[in-house]
């Protein structure tokens, strides 16, 4: 008869951000354990609260299935000695499999005979196998750990109880000094201990003790209660998903309530109030039907509604203390001047090897002007960009950003406007941080986008120049994220962006005055290009671009990011075209022969000699390629792709009538030069020879 398994690990309160990953990890490890131990099952469901991680598995058989498997051993020539006796290798092999040499048979594999034995393993009872679940519990990993009592063992929090049931039977094992049983604990303040008579009682019995073990159920309770409170007051409520997830993992039995604060605090910017409520207190802000912030909030307690008025007062009191600080910081910051803040940045270190934040701003101002001119900003825009880049980090030394680092840029915009800066300048100060995540909001304005590019590229160029290149998962300065942001901005704006040329210009400009800019940019150019292309590969994968197209694009003799995007898009969109396969095959043949020409001739500057042509196909292809090359540099990737595809009939005719690798050295070299000319244009789109066409 099939039985249900219940495993619960009882802990002291875990940090909210650890709860969901740990629940998923436990579920995955239990599934792996069952699979490895040949125990079938129907469903696996995981549960978690701040005080527990649990898994319930249905329909586990009473015992493992008997297993009969064929095991391969050493080769016959190793298994037998010169006299035909079993060698030590053979004897050791059968002993390890629990059989004897009489069970050996020989079978041929790839022309070689090997020893094989059939190994029979009788299935153990499920209960006996499941006693090894202690290994699953101790194998869980966490971002931070602690040890307690006199144990060397480390875990996210001390383990206080373990429930392990197979239907109604306790599965006996220990973790440290904690022995498994059938008793769990209810809510820390509202519930009692609860004893399960059967594994399937888990959710219902704990709910009686004010513990909702299913995270999605707790989350829905919070959503329903919060929406009901907002509807009752005619408020607008947009539940922040990240905060909702956190609050769900802070409570075992959620009860939502409304709190209030004095309207005078509404004079402080909304972002400050919302951040105070969200980041410090885990409250949800509410707005009226015009979208204006209200002097109220919705919060969630870990418990029922008994004495809720005391809970509300306590939460309001704590929030008011936060808002008093915020109001004070805001009023003090308004007394500061931008120039005074910028001056302070001279004494704020960006990195000991790269200089101060002030020096970084000096570099970014220079880089921003180079980029701004390349992407076609107007003179007025360049002037606004100049001002923004001279002051854009000033808010880092304000009281408000010191208290709420997540408001950097946001407060910079607000303070800049208060001090009479142009809106375009203020907006750029806020937008230069964007995007803040792989899918985050991008800068909307051209000035903000250029400043964001300059700031991020300065970080990449500077850290690479002093040898601080991310390795493995180690990226303390978020250079991968910043580079990914650069690529996303370029894609969004569609700007021409020749990275190598830009980096060379920046290096030359910065290196003219190292004392002013704080760093010498003379290393890491090639590494930067490869680093950027690796992030491009990552972005293209998220867009479901074929792996061979990604390989072809990233390997291209091209470092203009906008053109690489265009190449990926055109190849992805045309991959199913009827003429794609023959066109790519023709161009690949050209590229492969051109590589031989490269080996033979190097980067020759000598031109093609039409007088050496021997047939009509050579002449027609030569004329068509010359016509194409005249406009190739000024046309779009899509236009150049179409032009190259249109060469296919001429290329086919060329190969039908022309032998390239002939004995006449002059003719051979002339033909290779002709193919190298075509290949150079093709490879500027992508390494088309890497495409897999069927």
From Swiss-Prot:
EC number: 6.1.1.14
Catalyzed reaction equations: tRNA(Gly) + glycine + ATP = glycyl-tRNA(Gly) + AMP + diphosphate
Swiss-Prot/TrEMBL keywords: Aminoacyl-tRNA synthetase, ATP-binding, Cytoplasm, Ligase, Nucleotide-binding, Protein biosynthesis
A cellular-component GO term for this protein: cytosol
InterPro entries hit by this protein: DALR_anticod-bd, Gly-tRNA-synth_bsu, Gly-tRNA-synth_heterodimer
Location in the cell: Cytoplasm
Enzyme's top EC category: ligase
Entry annotated with the keyword Chaperone: no
Alphabetical GO biological process terms: arginyl-tRNA aminoacylation; glycyl-tRNA aminoacylation
SUPFAM superfamilies noted in UniProt: HD-domain/PDEase-like
UniProt keyword Zinc, yes or no: no
PROSITE patterns (UniProt xref): AA_TRNA_LIGASE_II_GLYAB (PS50861)
Gene Ontology MF terms in the entry: arginine-tRNA ligase activity; ATP binding; glycine-tRNA ligase activity
Domain of life: Bacteria
Family the entry assigns: Belongs to the class-II aminoacyl-tRNA synthetase family.
Assembly behavior: Tetramer of two alpha and two beta subunits.
Name of the protein: Glycine--tRNA ligase beta subunit
Organism this protein belongs to: Enterococcus faecalis (strain ATCC 700802 / V583)
């Amino acid at each position: 008869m099939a039985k249900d398994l219940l495993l619960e690990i009882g802990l002291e309160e875990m940090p909210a951000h650890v709860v969901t990953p740990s629940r998923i990890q436990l579920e995955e490890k239990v599934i792996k354990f069952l699979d490895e131990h040949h125990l079938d099952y129907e469903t696996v469901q995981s549960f978690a609260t701040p005080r527990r991680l649990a898994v319930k598995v249905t329909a586990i058989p009473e015992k493992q299935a008997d297993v009969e498997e064929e095991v391969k051993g050493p080769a016959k020539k190793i298994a037998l000695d010169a006299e035909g006796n079993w060698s030590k290798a053979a004897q050791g092999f059968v002993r390890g499999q629990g059989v004897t040499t009489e069970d050996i048979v020989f079978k041929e594999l790839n022309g070689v005979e090997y020893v094989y034995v059939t190994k029979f393993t009788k299935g153990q009872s499920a209960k006996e196998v499941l006693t090894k679940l202690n290994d699953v519990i101790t194998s869980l990993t966490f971002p931070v750990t602690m040890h307690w009592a006199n144990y060397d063992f480390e875990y996210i929090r001390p383990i206080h109880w373990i429930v392990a049931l197979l239907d109604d039977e306790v599965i006996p094992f220990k973790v440290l000094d904690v022995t498994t049983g059938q008793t769990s604990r209810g809510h820390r303040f509202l519930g009692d201990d609860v004893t399960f008579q059967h594994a399937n009682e888990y959710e219902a019995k704990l709910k009686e003790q004010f513990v909702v073990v299913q995270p999605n159920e707790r989350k829905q309770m919070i959503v329903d209660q919060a929406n009901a409170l907002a509807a009752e007051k005619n408020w607008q409520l947009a539940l922040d998903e990240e905060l909702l997830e956190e609050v769900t993992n802070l409570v075992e039995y959620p009860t939502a309530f409304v709190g209030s604060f004095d309207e005078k605090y509404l004079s402080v910017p909304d972002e400050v109030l919302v951040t105070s409520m969200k980041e410090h207190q885990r409250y949800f802000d509410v707005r009226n039907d015009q979208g204006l912030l209200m002097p109220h909030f919705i919060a969630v307690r870990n418990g029922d509604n008994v004495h809720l008025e005391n809970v509300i007062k306590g939460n309001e009191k704590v929030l008011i203390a936060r808002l008093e600080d915020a109001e004070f910081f805001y009023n003090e910051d308004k007394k500061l001047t931008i120039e005074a803040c910028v001056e302070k940045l001279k004494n704020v270190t960006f990195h000991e090897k790269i200089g101060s934040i002030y020096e970084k701003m000096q570099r970014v101002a220079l880089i921003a002007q180079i980029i701004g001119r390349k992407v076609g900003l107007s003179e007025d825009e360049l002037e606004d960009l100049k001002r923004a880049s001279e002051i854009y980090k000033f808010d880092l030394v304000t009281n408000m950003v010191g208290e709420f680092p997540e408001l950097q840029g946001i407060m910079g915009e607000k303070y800049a406007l208060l001090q009479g800066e142009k809106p375009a300048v203020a907006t750029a100060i806020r937008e230069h941080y964007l995007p803040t995540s792989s899918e985050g909001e991008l800068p909307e304005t051209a000035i903000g986008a250029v400043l964001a590019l300059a700031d991020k590229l300065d970080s990449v160029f500077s850290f690479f120049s002093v040898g601080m290149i991310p390795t493995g998962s180690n990226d303390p300065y978020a250079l991968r994220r910043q580079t990914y942001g650069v690529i996303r901005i370029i894609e969004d704006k569609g700007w021409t962006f020749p990275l190598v040329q830009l980096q060379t210009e920046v290096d030359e400009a910065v290196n003219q005055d190292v004392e002013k800019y704080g760093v010498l940019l003379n290393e890491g150019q090639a590494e930067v290009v490869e680093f950027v292309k690796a992030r491009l590969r990552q972005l293209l994968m998220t867009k479901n671009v074929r792996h061979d197209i990604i390989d072809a694009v990233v390997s291209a003799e091209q470092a203009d990011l906008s053109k690489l995007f265009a190449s990926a898009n055109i190849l992805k969109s045309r991959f199913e075209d009827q003429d794609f396969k023959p066109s790519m095959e023709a161009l690949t043949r050209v590229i492969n022969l051109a590589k031989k020409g490269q080996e033979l001739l190097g980067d020759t500057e000598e031109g093609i000699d039409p007088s050496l042509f021997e047939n009509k196909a050579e002449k027609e292809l030569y004329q068509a390629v010359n016509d194409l090359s005249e406009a190739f540099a000024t046309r779009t990737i899509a236009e150049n792709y179409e032009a190259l595809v249109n060469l296919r009939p001429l290329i086919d005719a060329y190969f039908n009538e022309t032998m390239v690798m002939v004995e006449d050295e002059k003719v051979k070299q002339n033909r290779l030069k002709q193919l190298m000319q075509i290949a150079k244009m093709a490879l500027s789109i992508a390494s088309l020879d890497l495409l897999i066409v069927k």
